[in-house]
A protein has these predicted regions:
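C-terminal alpha-helical "lid" subdomain
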Residues: 215-216, 223-328
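The feature captures the helix immediately C-terminal to the Walker
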Residues: 67-71, 257
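Mid-core helix/loop region of P-loop NTP-binding domains shared across ATPases and GTPases
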Residues: 27-37, 43-47, 101-108, 116-164, ...
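Post-Walker A helix-loop "phosphate-sensing" segment adjacent to the P-loop in P-loop NTPases
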Residues: 72-83, 115-118
Length: 328
């Protein structure tokens, strides 16, 4: 469902952006952007497009879903417009600088465009030592002519930076001066930042995803992953093992993949050649110590679940117990 929702969001955002590029207002905005590049007074008149966020826990597959969606949406890397002899890049993906540098992000956008269409916008900007205001005009013009959808990954970098609000403000100005859609991708940490002010929250409405719940989908993923065994002794996955994987991964798929992979690696190296709870626990203790602080709450819930199940006389399925624990 996440992949379908992300695909739909990106597709519609790209469509809205492309529809504006051949309008009269777009030509008027090009003139305004030219004045901005000269350091003169200018106005954003095209506007009308949108910015949105895709926020989710690290490791749940956001970037993979976005990459697949972009591949499906853009069968060709470039859209060539015969009437204007111009080239449009459907999706440009950049990373938010670690220090939330406005100038760094703008130059990164120009560099990405140069790589795709063979232009020299980046070199020109460096040569003339363009100021931030001039760069905003330059990137707005480039985006209006050559970019359909701009995706800014690792947006959570704005949270702990003094320039965070300035960078988001720059993206807002870029929307108003170019008419393109901008998607910001990050972790739940960035949601707290955007919720701190109304103008930020309004610009960041979008999709939010959490780690998986203990349900049929999680069980199915575990069974599929467990089938890829490279040890000499083949074992079958049990409900207890699936429960253990959930408790020690917090429902994050990438952690489950890493646990099963490292457990097999350890089992092969120590000669036991068997994927079981012993090898999984050894992998967790030796290879995932840095994650223990994040996964401990889930493990404690799992222990409470086990104790409660032993104390009760009624028969309760594992999925129901875990589901009740997660709800509480």
């Amino acid at each position: 469902f996440m992949s379908q929702e992300i695909y739909s969001k990106l597709y519609l955002a790209l469509l809205r952006s492309l529809q504006k590029k051949s309008t009269k207002v777009a030509v008027m905005q090009q003139n305004q952007n030219f004045w901005a590049m000269q350091g003169l007074e200018h106005h954003g008149i095209i506007g009308g497009s949108d910015s949105f966020t895709i926020i989710g826990v690290s490791g749940i597959g956001k970037s993979s879903a976005i990459s697949r969606a972009i591949t499906l949406i853009t069968e060709r890397k470039l859209i060539e417009v015969e009437e204007t002899q111009s080239k449009i890049i459907p999706c440009v993906m950049v990373q938010c600088p670690f220090d939330s540098s406005v100038k760094g992000l703008l130059l990164n956008v120009l560099h990405k465009v140069d790589e795709e269409i063979g232009s020299n916008y980046y070199e020109n900007a460096i040569r003339v030592r363009a100021t931030v205001d001039m760069l905003i005009g330059n990137v707005s013009q480039v985006a209006l002519n050559h970019i359909g959808l701009l995706i800014v990954d690792e947006i959570q970098n704005v949270c702990n930076s003094k320039q965070g609000k300035s960078l988001v403000g720059m993206l807002t100005q870029l929307i108003n001066n170019s008419g393109i859609s901008i998607c910001m991708v990050g972790t739940p940490e960035s949601a707290v930042f955007f919720e701190s002010a109304m103008q930020l929250a309004r610009r960041s409405l979008g999709l939010q995803y959490q780690a998986m719940e203990y349900n049929h989908d999680f069980q199915h993923i575990c069974k599929v992953l467990y089938s890829y065994q490279y040890t000499k002794k083949h074992t079958e996955i049990t409900d207890t093992m699936i429960e253990w994987l959930y408790e020690h991964s917090a429902g994050i798929v990438s952690v489950v993949v890493a646990l099963i992979h490292d457990a097999q690696e350890i089992a092969i190296l120590n000669g036991k050649e068997e994927l079981n709870l012993e090898s999984l626990n050894e992998a967790y203790q030796k290879r995932f110590s840095l994650l223990h602080g994040y996964l401990e709450p889930t493990i404690k819930k799992g222990k409470q679940t086990t104790n409660r199940r032993k104390a009760t006389t009624t028969s309760t399925t594992i999925s129901e117990v875990i589901e009740n624990t997660v709800v509480k």
